[in-house]
């Protein structure tokens, strides 16, 4: 089935510079660069080498912008398949369970390329101002009690009135743990840290970083984007920071259910046992008192963040008595969403 005029225009407008050429990056679309966001040195009392990967510099303020771009690339795949005559009909819609950040990032990209609006399943208790911001940029909103139970992808599509579409939350075919944040993962591991602290919400970012690390430690034929130190990387401890407190300031890291996450005790134990990461790599619960201290440090240094985004700094402060003070620490700040006014 031939593409319509509109579809031809959309396809032409989606330019993927390269899959993995650091000299020809794909993100952000209007000003591609690698690395796409800066890594800056910060001062943390008691530590001599602390660096912060600052994803707040992305278009809508968080690392989710990278995932948003990958959804545009997915639509490009849909259009190319239709152009080849492999599929028929109109472009499908995408659905997602979201607390706001991912929705704003993805919908901002979809809107820019004139693609179908994102269908968002939100918790009935989500802040009305966030809901209003999402609606303002075209998100279609559907509310339910997300604490009730984990939702199957079929239920997510049903609840978002999207029977012929696809659910981003659950789809393995989208390669969420190797593709959503692959460029970001290289930007992080190329710093060759001894310790890396990463917010753990859906788990996609943590899993991406570990999977890219595993890939580079398992081959002599490195990805062109890899510029790190293999020996150092093998012993890097990757710490995920999360919470099980529904009232935590790090609200984006709390989820009553994570049915689609791969990480579990056995998953990380195998990675450690195979030598794909340092021996202390794991996901840890943060305490609110250390999150408050992290907030004070971030404020004092003009870092743009939300509490969930600097959970890694909180975890470093929480573990400070067990950490060497002269090793290279890298904290991933996943940023702060710029909600449309």
State where each predicted segment sits.
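Phosphate-binding loop/pocket of nucleotide- and phosphate-handling active sites
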Residues: 4-5, 246-247, 311-341
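A glycine-rich, Thr/Ser-enriched phosphate-binding loop motif common to dinucleotide/cofactor-binding enzymes
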Residues: 57-74, 169-188, 304-311
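Alpha-helix C-terminal capping segments
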Residues: 73-81, 104-115, 210-217, 314-323
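Active-site/ligand-binding-proximal alpha/beta "capping" segment
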Residues: 159-220, 289-298
């Amino acid at each position: 089935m031939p593409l319509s005029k509109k579809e031809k225009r959309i396809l032409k407008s989606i330019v993927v510079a390269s899959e993995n050429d650091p000299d020809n990056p794909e993100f952000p679309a209007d000003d591609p660069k690698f690395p796409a966001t800066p890594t800056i040195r910060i001062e943390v009392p008691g530590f001599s080498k602390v660096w912060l990967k600052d994803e707040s510099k992305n278009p809508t303020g968080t690392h989710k912008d990278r995932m948003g771009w990958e959804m545009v690339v997915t639509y490009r795949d849909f259009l190319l398949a239709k152009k080849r005559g492999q599929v028929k009909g109109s472009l499908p819609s995408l659905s997602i369970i979201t607390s706001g950040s991912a929705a704003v990032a993805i919908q901002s990209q979809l809107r820019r390329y004139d693609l179908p609006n994102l269908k968002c399943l939100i918790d009935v208790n989500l802040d009305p101002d966030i809901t209003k911001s999402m609606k303002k940029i075209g998100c279609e909103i559907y509310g339910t009690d997300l604490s009730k139970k984990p939702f199957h992808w079929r239920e997510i599509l049903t609840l978002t009135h999207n029977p012929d579409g696809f659910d981003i939350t659950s789809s393995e075919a989208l390669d969420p743990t190797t593709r959503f944040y692959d460029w970001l993962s290289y930007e992080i591991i190329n710093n060759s840290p001894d310790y890396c602290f990463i917010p753990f919400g859906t788990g996609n970012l943590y899993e991406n970083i570990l999977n890219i690390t595993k890939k580079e430690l398992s081959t002599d034929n490195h990805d062109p984007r890899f510029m790190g130190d293999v020996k150092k990387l093998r012993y890097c401890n990757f710490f995920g920071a999360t919470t099980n407190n529904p009232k935590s300031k790090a609200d984006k890291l709390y989820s009553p259910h994570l049915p689609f996450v791969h990480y579990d005790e056995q998953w990380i134990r195998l990675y450690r046992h195979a030598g794909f990461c340092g021996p202390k790599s794991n996901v840890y619960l943060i305490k609110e008192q250390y999150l408050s201290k992290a907030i004070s440090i971030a404020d004092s240094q003009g870092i743009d963040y939300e509490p969930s985004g600097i959970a890694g700094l909180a975890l470093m402060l929480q573990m400070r008595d067990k950490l060497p003070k002269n090793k290279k620490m890298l904290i991933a700040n996943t940023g702060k969403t710029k909600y449309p006014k």
